[in-house]
C-alpha cells in the first residue's frame, strides 16, 4: 500500500515530507521519493529503491530550501521495484510532477495514445501517464488539464501535482483511494493517512471521491470533477 505526503507553507518542505513518509512506513513499500521546486523554479526529484532513510540521506546533502513539495512511498503494482519506477514521475516537458496511489485500469490504452502523440514513457508504471496526460491537455489552464486527465482515467487514484508554472500551489484529486488535507497557521498538508501529518495539525478534512483541491500555504479550494466550486464547512 503506497503512501502520499505533501506540504506548502512557511517551513522547509523536505523535513516535513521525510517525517511524513517515515510515519507511513507501516503501510509497506519498496521505494521512496520526493519532488520540490528548487531556487531556479524547476522541479527537483530525488527518488530511489529502498527505505525512506536512504532517501533522507540523499536529500540532506542537497540542503534544498523549498517550502513546497510532494512525496511518496511505493508498493509495486505495475513494474518492478526500481528507481525508474519510483515516484514522483514527471512529464516530457518537466513541467508537471505527480505522485499517485491507486491503479489505472486503462493505462495501456492511454500509454499507446501518448506514444502515438509523440510522448516517450520511461517507466513500467501506470502513474507516468498522468503527468504526460496533463501536459497533453494543458493549454494554459491546469485545472482544465487535470479535469480532462481525470476523465480519461479508469480506476482508482489519489494524486498530487506539482508544477513550476504554479509555484505556490499543489493540486490534488481523489477517487477510491484515501486522501486527507490538514490545515494550520504555518501551511497546509496533504497525506494518504493522518499519522503522516498529525505532528503538525489536528484540523483535517477527508476528501471525497471525484473531488479536486487547489492548495497553497494560506488556503484550500475544492471543486467537483467538472470544476464547479464546492463549499466545505
Predicted regions and their residues:
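Conserved short alpha-helical segments that host acidic/polar catalytic motifs at enzyme active sites
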Residues: 1-233
